[in-house]
Amino acid sequence: MKKITLLCVGLLLLIGCGRSLPVVKGEGQVLSKERKLPAYTQVRLECGADIVLTHGQVGDITINGSQNMEPYVITEVKNGVLIVRMSPDFAYQFTKKLEICIPVDESLTEVTVQGSGDITSHQQLQVKELTCNVLGSGDIDLSLQAESLSFSVKGSGDIKIKGTTQTLGVAIAGSGDFDGDALQTKQANASIRGSGDVELFVTEQLSADIRGSGDITIKGNPKKIDVQTKGSGRVRYL
């Protein structure tokens, strides 16, 4: 019985090894290709491409990259969520940057990185309430003007935000950091359950809970402070 089991395992391994994906290598000139999509209020990145959030007509996205790569980029809208990923039938070797420019407006409610790609903005974006999630190794770097912002890091990627908001929530459960020392907020709630660090600019009220090894650095001299520390991390005031 043991021999039969080992034989089956060996056959499965051989089958798995024989199913390696063909590689698509970026070739040719860098071209721009436009696509028209239905409206969306959320953006989710699930691959190694980069996304740039811009002002403009929602749904009119532009793909910039090697001319042979564009057909493999999947952009689909499901229940208001724009998902960006690569075709799963191939492996990819990016010789040039693959960038997708995605217009957004105040209706944007959520941005998620689940992969190695980054999400950035070259302009300040105006939103009402926005949640940003890092679940992989990619980073989020945005300039925002908002009423309420919420950030979650459960991977190794970092989040860097500048701008203004009324209320801010930050939850770290991974090794990634949150850099918000250029994001001015009146009220902030920060929680660390991992090793990532948090930097905040708070002017009125701060609530912080540290149960991991990450540190919280505060500037702005908030009037009300409630800090609970049960891990090895600490709070520093600038």
Language-model-detected regions and their locations in the chain:
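Sec-dependent bacterial lipoprotein signal peptides
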Residues: 1-17
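Short acidic/polar N-terminal linker immediately downstream of export determinants
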Residues: 17-70, 81-83, 87-103, 120-121
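Extended, compositionally simple hydrophobic/Ser/Thr-rich segments
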Residues: 41-53, 99-102, 107-238
